[in-house]
């Protein structure tokens, strides 16, 4: 598994000089409960490398964002305040959010999530704007801010989110901390390649299994 040596420099080296109207980011946040056993960076759960809050704040996203621009920022419920700080540091103003409800195959809440106070079955996408005249496109005014889908591998977000973003926000598009490549998107991250597949035990409908079904 690759890790980030100097994420800010790596991001500029790959995409510096370009400007994007819409940016999607799913940072590898560091967080844990009082036992430390649910943190992604825990030694028993070496699923992906994480970044400190200062490292995430220091990413030069503002240099890559056009004017106007949209930002979609995935944030765990427990790190809402940190997410708002990141959005501001990246040069965006928070406007609203979208909620991902994780469901089972039968449509009921998927209670396999973690949480110290409540069992989390949702995650947030914070939506922010940069510049003037930064409203969503016409489909955005009809799009509800709620998405219910099944979970895939650990931390993998629903592909349906891309369809929402592409309908509601203009390109060019950039995904930060991407898992795999996507047509018409620039991507960056240590798992942002065509050959991405999870290397750990995970749910049956993970990305590699999905790709096999699509080509069968």
Feature map (PLM): residue ranges:
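Class I S-adenosyl-L-methionine-dependent methyltransferase catalytic core
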Residues: 1-216
């Amino acid at each position: 598994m690759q890790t980030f040596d100097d994420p800010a420099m790596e991001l500029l080296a790959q995409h510096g000089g370009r400007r994007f109207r819409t940016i999607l980011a799913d940072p590898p946040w560091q967080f844990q409960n009082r036992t430390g056993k649910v943190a992604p960076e825990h030694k028993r759960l070496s699923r992906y490398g994480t970044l400190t809050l200062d490292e995430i704040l220091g990413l030069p996203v503002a240099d890559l964002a056009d004017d106007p621009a949209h930002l979609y920022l995935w944030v765990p419920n427990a790190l809402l305040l940190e997410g708002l700080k990141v959005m501001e540091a990246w040069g965006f103003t928070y406007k609203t959010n979208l909620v991902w409800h994780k469901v089972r195959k039968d449509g009921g809440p998927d209670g396999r999530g973690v949480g110290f106070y409540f069992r989390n079955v949702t995650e947030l996408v914070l939506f922010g704007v940069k510049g003037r005249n930064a409203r969503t496109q016409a489909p955005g005014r009809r799009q509800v801010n709620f998405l219910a889908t099944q979970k895939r591998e650990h931390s993998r977000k629903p592909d349906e989110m891309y369809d929402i973003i592409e309908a509601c926000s203009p390109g060019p598009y950039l995904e930060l901390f991407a898992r795999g490549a996507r047509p018409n998107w620039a991507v960056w991250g240590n798992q942002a390649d065509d050959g991405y597949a999870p290397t750990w035990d995970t749910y049956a409908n993970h990305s590699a299994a999905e790709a096999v079904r699509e080509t069968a």
